[in-house]
Each structure stands twice: as C-alpha cells, then as structure tokens.
Amino acid sequence: MTTATRFPQFSQDLASDPTTRRLWYGIATAHDFETHDGMTEERLYQKLFATHFGHLAIIFLWASGNVFHIAWQGNYEQWVANPTGVTPIAHAIWDPHFGKAAVEAFTQPGGGGPVNAAYSGLYYWFNTIGLRTNGDLYAGAIGLLLLAAVFLFAGWLHLQPRFRPSLSWFKNAEARLNHHLAGLFGVSSLAWTGHLVHVAIPESRGQHVGWDNFLTTLPHPAGLKPFFTLNWGVYAQNPDTANHVWGTAEGAGTAILTFLGGFNPNTQSLWLTDMAHHHLAIAVIFIVAGHMYRTNWGIGHSIREILGAHNPPKGTPFGGLLGEGHKGLYDTVNNSLHFQLALALACLGVVTSLVAQHMYALNPYVFMSMDHTTEAALYTHHQYIAGFLMVGAFAHGAIFLVRDYDPEANKNNVLARVLDHKEAIISHLSWVSLFLGFHTLGLYVHNDVMQAFGTPEKQILIEPVFAQFIQASHGKMIYGMDVLLSNPDSLASTAWPNYGNVWLPGWLQAINDPNGSLFLPIGPGDFLVHHAIALGLHTTTLILVKGALDARGSKLMPDKKDFGYSFPCDGPGRGGTCDISAWDAFYLAMFWMLNTIGWVTFYWHWKQLGVWSGNTAQFNENSTYLMGWLRDYLWANSAQLINGYNPYGMNNLAVWAWMFLFGHLVWATGFMFLISWRGYWQELIETLVWAHERTPLAKLIRWKDKPVAMSIVQGRLVGLAHFTVGYVLTYAAFVIASTASQSG
C-alpha cells in the first residue's frame, strides 16, 4: 500500500478523495488521533503527551510576547510611580490608515504616538509580585522564552524512540496523581510562597530584592529561628498598618504570614501577607496529598480499592440504592482519555468561573479595583472561558459514552444506573427548566405591562430573603437581620477559643464597605435575573445531559452508538434520525451557553456600573422589567459606542465602535451557514465553478480537487463558529467602551 503524499497523511481514505472534502475533513480530524491510520493505544498516549509540551511552549511564548511588548512599548515605570493616574499601555499601534484625528485620539498625554490601552490587568499583577522596572520585565520575557524553548525540546524528545514513555507508565494513575498533587500544585505553591515572601513583600515595603541580593536579604528580621523553634506566630506579628503606603516603608510592618482578612485600604486589594499565608497552606495540603496514593512502596491508598468499597451498606442513607456502587470505575476512567478530559474540563470550568467572581469581589492585585474597565474585561473574559470549558466537558463525556464505555465492565454500577435512569433525570431537568422559564418570564412581562400602562406600583417585586439571610449570616448589616456574624452576641461571634476574634478582623469591615464589591446589596431585580440565569444554566445542562445520556442509543434509534459521535441522519429512509447525534446536542447547547453567559455578564456589568458611579438606584429600579434591560443597560450604554466615529470626526472609542459593528457582521454571517442547507451551497458552488472556468484569467487556475459543499455537520460548525466569535467580539467591544467612556 502506498503512503499518502498529500494532505492528510494520517488518512489514506481522505488523501485519495478527489473532492475538496479531503481538505475539510482533513482539518476536522487532524486532532482526532484515535481515528488516524495505524494508530495504537500506546502511540496515541505518546502523541498526546508530546502535544502537551507543545501547548505549554505556545502559552509561554504568548506570555513572553505580552511581557516583552509592555517592557518595550509600554509605560510601566511611569505607571508604577502613579498607578491610579496613568493609563497602562499594552503596546504601540502602527497603522497606515490612521489620519491626524486618529493619531491624536490614540496618543496619550506626553506620549510618542498612538497606543493601545492595556485592560489585561498585567500591570497590576507585575506591581503586586514585586516587579518595578522595565529591566525586570525584559528578564521575565527572556525567561519565559527560554522556558518555551525547553518545552518545545521536551516535546520533540519524548517522540524519539528512546524517550517515549510506555503505555503502563501512562496508565499508572496513582503515581501520576501523587506527582501532580505534590509536584504540580504543592511544590509550585511553595515556590510561589517563596517568591511572595522573599521578593514581593519586601518590594511592597520599599526594600528592593533582585538577583544581586535575594540570597543575602532576610525576609523577616528573626530569620528561620521561629520556624525551627516552632514559634511560628512570630511571622504574623507586626503586620502592615492601615496607613501603609504601597512600595514604601511608611506604615510597613515586618510580618510575612498573616491572617488579617479584608483589604489593604491603600491598595484596595487583599493583604499580600495573607496571600503568602494562603499559598503556604495550599502547599502543605497538596504536598501531604501527594503522598496519599499507593505506588511502588506499598503504602497509602489504592484508588481501585477505594472505589470498590464506595457503596453504602443497607440500612444507611442510599444503602442498597447504588447497585454495585463505584465498582469498575477505576478502569473505566483510567482507560478513557475522553472521560479524563471531561472531568478535567468540568473542574477547570468551575474554577475559571470562580476566578471571574473572585478577581473583583476579593481582588488580589494592588490598585486594580480602581481600574473599572480592566475589572469588567477580566470578569467577562473568565466567565465566557468557563462556559466553553463546561460545554467541552459534556462533549467529551458524550464521546466517552459513544467510543469508550463498556457495559460489561460497568454492570449495575453508578454509571450504568445513571444511564438506566436517564428518563427520570432528563424529565426532571426539563420540568425545572420549564418552571423557571415560565415563572421568570411571566414576572418580567407582568412588570413590563405595569410600566407600560403607567402603574409601576403594581409590579410584582419579590425580595430575595433567603439570599439576604445568607449575606447577613456572613456579617452584612444592611438588612438588620441580626443573625450569626451580623449579631455580635451570637455564637459565631463569641465562640471559643478567642471570643469574637475567631473571624478575620478585616472581614466585617470589608463586607460592609459601601464602596466595595463584596456581597453587594440585593433586591427584586437581582431575584429575577438570578432566576433567569438559573433557567439558562438548567436548560444548557438539560441539552448537554440529554445529548450524553442518549448518545449510545434511544427508543427512537437504539443503534445510535454505531453511527459515532457526530452524524447528520441515517439516510432518508429512517425518519426522525436527523439532529439527534450527541454532536447536535453540543451544537444546540453552545447557543444556550452563550445566551446564559450573556445574561450573567449583562447583570454583573450593569450592577457594577451602578456601584462604580454611586448610582445603584438605576439598576434597582429598572432591572425588574425587560424594557429596563433593553433601554437602560443595552441601549443607554451603547450610545457612546456607536458615536465612536461620525460625520463630524472621531474619538478614542472609534476602534471599539468599529469592532462593535464588525462583531455584528461576523455574528450575522453565521446565520448564512446556519439557515441555508447543503444543496443550496452545492448549486452555488457549481455556478461559481462554471463562471470561473469561463473567465479569461481565472480559468488559468484549476482545482486539483472537485469543489463540493461542506457536510451538514461542518456547515453548522462554521455557522456556530461565526455566531460565537461575532457574539463575543460584539460584547467585548461593548463592555470595554461603555466602561472606559464612564470610568476612563
């Protein structure tokens, strides 16, 4: 058999296809290593292992580029001297299309030419971790570049015959878990604690620590003596005062590991010494956890044994209701890369959404909470990424069920029982989604009608009393509920061992600060939008769960698994088999995910605009009906945006105004692929080819491949990609421009 000499070399079938299908299917399956010619399980693991190094190299190269351009074309040193008065610069702009007005609009006062403002938050991170000069940034950029080179080499090396790990090495789950827990999380957290204690904290107190003196500068006056004499409390004594001026010794203490809680009033960020303590605690926990599982030494837990015993006995809660419990899951997870990826994506998705929340509510970076545009950009960015990761988790979960699930190995265990109970699971999710949808929309529409008819007092406004109770129990005083931490006489406030000081002293001050973003006061508008978001989350979950649980087969199509993860239909002779592949569920869920995160970010942004401007009444009064959202959030805040350029000139929002329009264009283009069907494109292509072959110059260029329309699934993918990219581009421009126009 001759090997393919043209793309794709990994598939003989596709390489010999005479149509443009060769290109599109080649691109679509380039990363689906499992389906490549001659692929073995061991080779599959080795290729994936090597690609991880390549992936890391790209990430480090990208990070290096960001740091390098800030050092080269940014204004980092001027910004460090005045972080609340100078706008950080990402990089310079060279654009031959810029006229005089544009050059002036995008040039900062005293600047040498047009620049891009930085809304990434990198400046704040650099400042927090103790970098002070462009030289520090150049050193970081070069270090990241060297690291990228090391990882590229490692990727190449692990593809060489002598350095390819064996399949048994990849399947050694306990050893991998130990190393990832202790090494990846534990030791890296310890190293980060070291950096914070030895470099960042001294720099925050005006003492420079660099490569020249970091081995001779004591981070604490007592040195290591308290550590070895177990007198660790010394490291928490004499923390920075509330009057500490960042980057100077004024008001500075000597503590390196504290438990203050709340924020530094000067920087409006978490105390650096609290964060060092946090990372040290994480390091200890994970290094201990990394010694938990049994490997060559014969000590510790066996995950297989733990899972085998995971079955509550009869007479206890759930006893006897779980069948074989978790038996068989060890091999099921360990032998399926898709299952492992699904679990990893689900965890990472949750963590990324938490990052979005904590970046503003418990802001770790000095002075960043005063840069509202950066805060808004980071929240939106992380929330969208969380959505993509979560949908990806379900997609790979469904691929696992189609390709890797073994019914014999999982007989009557929890996984099999989930599949057996799929009707109950899907119908309950469906009921919840319908309930949330009709009730929430009903309340919004009722309130709209009351507004429209001039009787706003007849709106149905429901106070979120349970959520307010939770806020009050954490110490929020505004509701007057006197419960737990908001009641100084409660057990939470007086508990042993230290009567009232058991809670972090700065916490109550932070949670009750009217200018902060921690536990914002909530009312009827919040109640409604929370339920709208719950509708979106439950419907997205319903679509994804149904897609996964029906991926192997349904009453309509019992042999579905034989058709693979994505198929359009089973021919014209079998009615109702279109749009029911697991891929179609992923495709539909993507729209719901984007929609839901739209509501999440609209809500967050509108509420925060009120907090930042000091006018919280606008959100509170106008978020209880739909016209309020359309008029007072979307329309009112896009007014600045669509005026970025006009017949009379332009301003520094012009680039965002253009991006706003361009995003709409990309988004609208998606419908061209989503609505028209394959035959239409085939006829269009045939007409274009006919015209091409009869045009004097064009006919000199001939295709080697016969042009054919994309498959139905590919057309949908292209449509979805345009819809998604356009949607995100449009909202990114809206968030940045509307916030920057109000906050600078």
Curated annotation (Swiss-Prot):
Residue numbers binding chlorophyll a B1: H664
GO MF annotation list: 4 iron, 4 sulfur cluster binding; chlorophyll binding; electron transfer activity; magnesium ion binding; oxidoreductase activity
Transmembrane segments: 48-71, 137-160, 177-201, 275-293, 337-360, 376-402, 424-446, 527-545, 585-606, 653-675, 717-737
Gene3D superfamilies per record: Photosystem I PsaA/PsaB (1.20.1130.10)
Location in the cell: Cellular thylakoid membrane
Its job: PsaA and PsaB bind P700, the primary electron donor of photosystem I (PSI), as well as the electron acceptors A0, A1 and FX. PSI is a plastocyanin/cytochrome c6-ferredoxin oxidoreductase, converting photonic excitation into a charge separation, which transfers an electron from the donor P700 chlorophyll pair to the spectroscopically characterized acceptors A0, A1, FX, FA and FB in turn. Oxidized P700 is reduced on the lumenal side of the thylakoid membrane by plastocyanin or cytochrome c6.
One of the record's GO cellular component terms: photosystem I
Protein encoded by which gene: psaB
Catalyzed reactions: reduced [plastocyanin] + hnu + oxidized [2Fe-2S]-[ferredoxin] = oxidized [plastocyanin] + reduced [2Fe-2S]-[ferredoxin]
Membrane topology value: Multi-pass membrane protein
Sequence positions that bind chlorophyll a B3: M672, Y680
Organism name: Synechococcus sp. (strain JA-2-3B'a(2-13))
PANTHER family recorded: OUTER MEMBRANE PROTEIN, OMPA-RELATED, PHOTOSYSTEM I P700 CHLOROPHYLL A APOPROTEIN A1-RELATED
InterPro entries recorded: PSI_PsaA/B, PSI_PsaA/B_CS, PSI_PsaA/B_sf, PSI_PsaB
Cofactor-binding details, from the entry: PSI electron transfer chain: 5 chlorophyll a, 1 chlorophyll a', 2 phylloquinones and 3 4Fe-4S clusters. PSI core antenna: 90 chlorophyll a, 22 carotenoids, 3 phospholipids and 1 galactolipid. P700 is a chlorophyll a/chlorophyll a' dimer, A0 is one or more chlorophyll a, A1 is one or both phylloquinones and FX is a shared 4Fe-4S iron-sulfur center.
Positions bound to phylloquinone: W681
Record-listed [4Fe-4S] cluster binding positions: C569, C578
Family: Belongs to the PsaA/PsaB family.
UniProt EC number: 1.97.1.12
Protein name in UniProt: Photosystem I P700 chlorophyll a apoprotein A2
Keywords recorded for this protein, A-Z: 4Fe-4S, Chlorophyll, Chromophore, Electron transport, Iron, Iron-sulfur, Magnesium, Membrane, Metal-binding, Oxidoreductase, Photosynthesis, Photosystem I, Thylakoid, Transmembrane, Transmembrane helix, Transport
Domain of life according to the entry: Bacteria
GO biological process: photosynthesis
Subunit field text: The PsaA/B heterodimer binds the P700 chlorophyll special pair and subsequent electron acceptors. PSI consists of a core antenna complex that captures photons, and an electron transfer chain that converts photonic excitation into a charge separation. The cyanobacterial PSI reaction center is composed of one copy each of PsaA,B,C,D,E,F,I,J,K,L,M and X, and forms trimeric complexes.
PROSITE patterns linked: PHOTOSYSTEM_I_PSAAB
Pfam families documented for this protein: PsaA_PsaB (PF00223)
